[in-house]
């Protein structure tokens, strides 16, 4: 059985992790977002915002972690595996910062492809900032555009998840995947 790899993408505070947690509670296999853990590990070493202080180091760690998750999904015996963000997010955020990075980043993104990409657009009603999520809502709108550009650059079609309750958004995802069969 080929496992379908499905990425939920979007800027900060768009509801991705909430949906991943809801999908997990319904029995779906989900790969969690790892950027918060990388940030927390750096903070324990005295680096407040590794992404801002050394975006390339942060992004290398993130790319490696997401690549590991992607490869791990190949051994999962489930029809669907959901990812909280995908590999091209790394490139999108570096482009947002106008930061250079090795061509190998794009090579990895081209090599490991997802079957479906769902995008959650910025939604001011649910937007929150915290110690790891420092971007303003206006910055989230800009990041969203970089994400769209990055994924399209790698040949993806994006499926917009409409605003709604968590259950409505989950239903939309599951119904879309059922129609795609």
Each language-model region and where it sits:
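P-loop (Walker A) phosphate-binding loop of NTP-binding proteins
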Residues: 11
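Hydrophobic anchor at the beta1->P-loop junction of P-loop NTPases
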Residues: 8
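A glycine- and Lys/Arg-enriched "phosphate-lid" helix/loop adjacent to the NTP-binding pocket
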Residues: 98-164
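Glycine-rich phosphate-binding loop used to anchor ATP phosphates in small-molecule kinases
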Residues: 59-112
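Conserved glycine(s) of the Walker
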Residues: 15
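Conserved substrate/cofactor phosphate-moiety recognition/catalytic segment
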Residues: 24-65
């Amino acid at each position: 059985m080929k496992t379908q790899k499905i990425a939920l993408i979007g800027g900060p505070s768009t509801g991705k992790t909430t949906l991943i947690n809801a999908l997990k509670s319904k029995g779906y296999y989900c790969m969690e977002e790892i950027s918060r853990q990388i940030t927390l590990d750096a903070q324990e070493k005295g680096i407040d915002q590794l992404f801002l202080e050394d975006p390339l180091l942060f992004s290398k760690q993130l790319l490696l972690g997401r690549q590991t998750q992607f490869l791990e999904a190949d051994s999962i015996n489930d029809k669907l595996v959901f990812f909280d963000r995908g590999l091209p997010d790394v490139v999108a955020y570096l482009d947002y910062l106008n930061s250079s990075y090795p061509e190998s980043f794009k090579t990895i993104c081209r090599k490991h492809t997802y079957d479906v990409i769902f995008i959650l657009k910025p939604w001011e009603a649910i937007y929150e900032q915290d110690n790891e999520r420092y971007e303003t809502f206006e910055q989230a709108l800009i990041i969203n555009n970089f994400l769209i550009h990055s994924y399209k650059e790698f040949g993806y079609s994006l499926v917009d998840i409409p605003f709604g309750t968590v259950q409505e958004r989950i239903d939309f995802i599951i119904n879309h995947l059922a129609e795609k069969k």
